[in-house]
Amino acid sequence: MDLPVNRFKQRLRSGEAQIGLWLGLADPYCAELAANAGFDWLLLDGEHAPNDLRSLLGQLQALAPYPGQPVIRPVQGDTALIKQLLDIGAQTLLVPMVDSAAQAEGLVRAVRYPPAGVRGVGSALARASRWNSVAEYLNHADEQMCLLVQVENLEGLANLDAIAAVEGVDGVFIGPADLSAAMGHRGNPGHPEVQAAIEDAIHRIRTAGKAAGILSADETLARRYLELGCAFVAVGVDTSLLMRSLRELAGRFKGGAPAPSASSSVYG
């Protein structure tokens, strides 16, 4: 059996833009439905959605037959948690709240086997190796790992150039929701000051030769980020899409205008 090729990483290197969807429903059936819609990548959120290791495993299994590539965001950049996520088959991670080059370097080590890193060796127990059915898994697994780091506060912005320069970081994702809050514009990522910071960050990431990514459910902003050269852009969130559709349907039959969404334009 051959090691699965990380097509998300391949396309990042080619410079081809990839369109994604954020998944927070934490359910394999819902994840498969989203995959069937045709997105290039699907973010399985372990930071703000009620996911655990088993629910993420189920979603990875549900997505496996589809071309859309799974990206997992863990709750934090914990080495032991990263080891577990890689063992269940994750090949691309988006790690939140990365503030320094030293932190990014530690994450690079966490996704690699020794001697290049510190990932624990337990491939006989791991879905990633198909329980040691993938030939030469230990010798080639590192090649398919894709590490995305999320910069989303003022410290991270200040250290962005150093973070993007870290070897082994494949892409840098700008987190508009937390960044706007850190800049004093909580809930308003469309504020001109926030947008100026985001556009500058995208330019700096691309200048460093790394892929830039972002999430925005605002179509105008999402298209703007693509024009600026973002390589991976999530353009919606499953919970927001479902909530909006349900409110609209209820409103049509029960009368009255649908209740407005309390979410920022980041999530829809």
UniProtKB/Swiss-Prot annotation:
Primary gene name: PA50071_1
Assigned keywords, A-Z: Cobalt, Lyase, Magnesium, Manganese, Metal-binding, Pyruvate
Single GO term (MF): aldehyde-lyase activity
Site for Increases basicity of active site His, residues: D87
Entry function: Aldolase which can catalyze in vitro the aldolisation reaction between hydroxypyruvate (HPA) or pyruvate (PA) and D-glyceraldehyde (D-GA). The condensation of hydroxypyruvate and D-glyceraldehyde produces (3R,4S,5R)-3,4,5,6-tetrahydroxy-2-oxohexanoate as the major product, 2-dehydro-D-gluconate and 2-dehydro-D-galactonate. The condensation of pyruvate and D-glyceraldehyde produces 2-dehydro-3-deoxy-L-galactonate as the major product and 2-dehydro-3-deoxy-D-gluconate. Also catalyzes the retro-aldol type decarboxylation of oxaloacetate, a general property of known pyruvate aldolases.
Domain of life: Bacteria
Binding positions for a divalent metal cation per the UniProt entry: E152, D178
InterPro entries referenced in this protein's UniProt entry, alphabetically: Aldolase/citrate-lyase_domain, HpaI, HpcH-HpaI_aldolase, Pyrv/PenolPyrv_kinase-like_dom, Pyrv_kinase-like_dom_sf
Cofactor note text: Shows a slight preference for Mn(2+).
Keyword Metal-binding: yes
Protein name: Hydroxypyruvate/pyruvate aldolase
Species in which this protein is naturally found: Pseudomonas aeruginosa
Keyword Cytoplasm appears in the UniProt entry: no
Family named by the database record: Belongs to the HpcH/HpaI aldolase family.
Gene Ontology BP annotations: phenylacetate catabolic process
Gene3D superfamilies noted in UniProt: Phosphoenolpyruvate-binding domains
EC number from the UniProt entry: 4.1.2.-
Catalytic activity: D-glyceraldehyde + 3-hydroxypyruvate = (3R,4S,5R)-3,4,5,6-tetrahydroxy-2-oxohexanoate; D-glyceraldehyde + 3-hydroxypyruvate = 2-dehydro-D-gluconate; D-glyceraldehyde + 3-hydroxypyruvate = 2-dehydro-D-galactonate; D-glyceraldehyde + pyruvate = 2-dehydro-3-deoxy-L-galactonate
Cofactor: Mn(2+); Mg(2+); Co(2+)
